[in-house]
């Protein structure tokens, strides 16, 4: 739970309103970067950025009726982004005429909800709240994909229990070995364009590659959806990312997202939903498989969604899928999820952003200026051109063509072609001595396509080690994990320290062809497919759309907006004065002055505290001095699916991949303080519950990852953002160590919405206001989390 979040669990709250007043694929495979992000550009607070008004001036807004899916160019009242339009369709209980906007808290009933190996904990939550029947079994999809190589009796029993539950409730179920859940959601048509599709996994963003609004939920949310068909969501700030140019030969979607993560690496899109856009020509250079890769890794970029438009490229892809489905499953007819009739219906009125839709920020990237690129080691925010790493002769021990990010048939074909070219008509060459190259397809159908094309056989002949279609090493499970001292390169999505094995190993990320070329050579290398366009010397990125004329117009619109806002404020104040008597008006001014005086005296307004919720929370500060501490650092993946792990063990392993000394340094009752973007990464709820198991009641950070905030709320872990405290700790303790006991004291006065810091014995004491903690959040925490809250509500029904 984070103080600035105000979830409503099963009700709708409107957080704020806004006035819109603004105007052959592998032949393209490959990023030479010599640009740096703007110095000092650190957008740490997701909700503090001034909205950028797009496309229209205030005078162009007209009260014109329009379809909710009006095409760009259609002027409507209260224009919406694509994200807002989709949420509008799946929000329930809205007041009549309400149009949702970024910042609103809404109750959503998503089209689909997928769970995977975490389904059994969801089952236990589902039953513990008193639910006996899934609200809508057509809404739920269950897949087994994470720990499929674990043949222990306990894991096999868990898998069988999950299957039995799914069968009992008539839920669509996909067994271990069928593929990764996200890929199944795509290829089976569950993630349909224009729908809100969620999963209890952080890479649900991937559905945006087929123009579905995909976003992660956590286990407790999934249980709520199973039981009631709905859960809560706050519509995030929305960023527009415009692509210009076209991908050069040898550049991939993986290179695009690595570039975005590395070049915009100051949390520009942290906790945002991203809408990708560009000209028809530009977007046609991004096939659906590349879009899936890009959307998938918007998670690593810090976003909670990343959606592409519904366009002709998507239509062609859907047509091909529908034709294959009709050929292979003629008996299904209209019951199939991907049909030509459904496609026709979709494209009769596809959702698109309105003219004048409001975006929190706008960024652009010129695809023509990209070249092959590698992320790492152990970070997606650090990236280097392949050609520069080739000159360093970095030896590798392991290579991986795995994950929902890049192990589809097209990716497997790209890797196989590296070996075919090296064969030059002769025998397929072997992987370099001392290198282990692990391959597993994103799904069984994708593997079958690769087998029919001969690509799978090429990789096996080269000496690749086959694993089942599942998550495997990407999650740090199964065979082939990185050992201490290893260097690995992977086509997956995360290379965080300890993610794919030992924290003493180094992991890089790259496209499938770069991974294959590296495995063949025994060191990081590219396949040599990149053809640099004439005149390209650097990657072109920036704020805005990349269109100087349009961006200049937007700047003018922003200036006008500021003037109009000031005028509206003055008019509003005058109207209120006129509506009141002179005495009342004088009283209002007097009260305002009194309030200011009271604030100067430190006498803050009080909020109500519900029974069972503490008025104050205090303790000694233990400081983890790092930004972007991810969920793998907080709670390693190797423990995530050990459902029988004890609370004491959780307390011992918390922060293990970040700093093993944390367990001995931190004590029950401490206040954990960390840097910015704390808790980024996966949806595992143990990142929150393990901190609670350690006896730590409150986490303070410069900012939080959205999914960690959600898990905190649902599991009754308190949190508050105090960037000033992080800055002061770093100023005072110059020597950077992973974890330190500071001797400082922290107190959160919930009733007064104020925090007080005492900087050591005899040190300075200072205070500042923080966001109010509303009653509904207090209620959830007071009863021990959302699961118990829902159970209580069900028992009262």
UniProtKB/Swiss-Prot annotation:
Pathway: Amino-acid biosynthesis; L-lysine biosynthesis via AAA pathway; L-alpha-aminoadipate from 2-oxoglutarate: step 3/5. GO terms for cellular component: mitochondrion. It comes from Chaetomium globosum (strain ATCC 6205 / CBS 148.51 / DSM 1962 / NBRC 6347 / NRRL 1970) (Soil fungus). GO terms for molecular function: 4 iron, 4 sulfur cluster binding; homoaconitate hydratase activity; metal ion binding. Catalyzes the reversible hydration of cis-homoaconitate to (2R,3S)-homoisocitrate, a step in the alpha-aminoadipate pathway for lysine biosynthesis. This is Homoaconitase, mitochondrial. It is found in: Mitochondrion. Its cofactor is [4Fe-4S] cluster. Belongs to the aconitase/IPM isomerase family. Residues 1-47 form a transit peptide. Its EC number is 4.2.1.36.
């Amino acid at each position: 739970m984070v103080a600035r979040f105000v979830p409503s669990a099963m009700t709708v709250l409107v957080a704020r309103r806004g006035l819109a007043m603004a105007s052959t694929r592998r032949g393209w495979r490959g990023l030479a970067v010599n640009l740096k992000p703007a110095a000092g550009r650190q957008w740490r607070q997701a909700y503090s950025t001034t909205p950028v008004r797009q496309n229209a001036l205030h005078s162009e807004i007209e009260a014109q009726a329009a379809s909710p899916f009006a095409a760009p160019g259609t002027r409507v009242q209260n224009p919406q982004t694509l994200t807002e339009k989709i949420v509008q369709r799946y929000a329930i209980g809205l007041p009549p005429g309400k149009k949702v906007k970024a910042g609103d808290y809404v109750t959503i009933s998503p089209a689909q909800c997928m769970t995977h190996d975490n389904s059994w904990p969801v089952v236990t939550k589902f039953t513990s709240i008193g639910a006996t029947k899934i609200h809508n079994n057509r809404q739920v999809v269950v897949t087994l994909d994470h720990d499929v190589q674990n043949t222990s009796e306990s894991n096999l029993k868990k898998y069988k229990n999950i299957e039995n539950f799914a069968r009992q409730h008539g839920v669509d179920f996909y067994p271990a070995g069928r593929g990764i859940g996200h890929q199944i959601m795509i290829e089976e048509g569950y993630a349909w364009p224009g729908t809100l599709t969620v999963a209890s996994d952080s890479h649900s963003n991937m559905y945006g590659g087929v123009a579905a609004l995909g976003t992660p939920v956590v286990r407790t949310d999934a249980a709520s959806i199973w039981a009631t068909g709905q859960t809560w969501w706050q519509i995030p700030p929305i960023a527009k990312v415009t692509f210009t140019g076209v991908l050069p030969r040898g550049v991939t979607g993986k290179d695009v997202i690595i570039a975005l993560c590395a070049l915009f690496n100051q949390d520009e899109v942290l906790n945002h939903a991203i809408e990708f856009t560009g000209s028809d020509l530009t977007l046609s250079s991004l096939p659906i498989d590349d879009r899936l890769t890009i959307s998938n890794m918007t998670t690593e970029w810090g976003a909670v969604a990343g959606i592409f438009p519904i366009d002709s490229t998507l239509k062609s892809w859907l047509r091909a899928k529908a034709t294959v489905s009709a050929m292979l499953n003629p008996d299904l007819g209209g019951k199939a999820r991907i049909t030509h009739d459904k496609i026709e219906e979709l494209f009769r009125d596809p959702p698109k952003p309105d003219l004048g839709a409001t975006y929190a920020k706008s960024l652009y990237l010129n695809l023509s200026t990209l070249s092959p690129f590698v992320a790492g080691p152990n970070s997606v925010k650090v990236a280097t051109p392949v050609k520069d790493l080739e000159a360093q002769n970095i030896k590798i021990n392991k290579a991986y063509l795995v994950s929902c990010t890049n192990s589809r048939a097209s990716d497997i074909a790209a890797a196989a072609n590296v070996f075919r070219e090296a064969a030059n008509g002769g025998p397929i060459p072997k992987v370099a001595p001392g290198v282990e190259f692990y391959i597993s397809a994103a799904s069984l159908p994708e593997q079958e396509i690769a087998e029919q094309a001969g690509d799978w056989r090429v990789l096996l002949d080269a000496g690749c080690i086959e694993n089942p279609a599942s998550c495997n090493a990407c999650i740090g499970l199964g065979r082939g994990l990185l050992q201490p001292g290893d260097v690995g390169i992977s086509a997956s999505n995360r290379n965080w320290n300890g993610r794919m094995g030992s924290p003493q190993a180094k992991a890089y990320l790259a496209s499938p062809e770069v991974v294959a070329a590296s495995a063949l050579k025994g060191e990081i290398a590219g396949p040599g497919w990149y053809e640099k366009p004439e005149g390209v010397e650097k990657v072109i990125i920036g704020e805005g759309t990349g269109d100087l004329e349009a961006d200049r117009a937007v700047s003018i619109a922003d200036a006008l907006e500021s003037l109009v806002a000031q005028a509206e404020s003055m008019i509003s104040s005058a109207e209120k004065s006129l509506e009141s008597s002179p005495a009342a008006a004088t009283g209002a001014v007097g009260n305002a002055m009194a309030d200011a005086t009271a604030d100067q005296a430190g006498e803050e307004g009080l909020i109500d505290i519900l029974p069972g919720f503490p008025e104050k929370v205090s303790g000694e500060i233990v400081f983890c001095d790092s930004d972007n501490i991810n969920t793998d650092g907080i709670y390693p993946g190797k423990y995530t699916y050990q459902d029988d792990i004890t609370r004491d063990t959780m307390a011992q392993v918390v922060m293990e991949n970040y700093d093993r000394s944390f367990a001995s340094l931190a004590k029950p009752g401490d206040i954990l303080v960390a840097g910015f973007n704390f808790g980024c990464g996966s949806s595992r709820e143990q990142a929150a519950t393990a901190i609670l198991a350690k006896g730590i009641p409150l986490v303070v950070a410069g900012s939080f990852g959205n999914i960690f905030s959600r898990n905190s709320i649902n599991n009754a872990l308190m949190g508050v953002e105090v960037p000033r405290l992080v800055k002061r700790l770093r100023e005072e303790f110059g020597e950077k160590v992973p974890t330190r006991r500071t001797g400082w004291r922290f107190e959160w006065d919930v009733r007064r919405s104020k925090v007080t810091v005492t900087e050591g014995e005899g040190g300075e004491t200072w205070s500042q206001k923080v966001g109010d903690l509303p009653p509904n959040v207090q209620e959830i925490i007071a009863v021990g989390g959302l699961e118990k809250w829902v159970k209580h509500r069900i028992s009262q029904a």
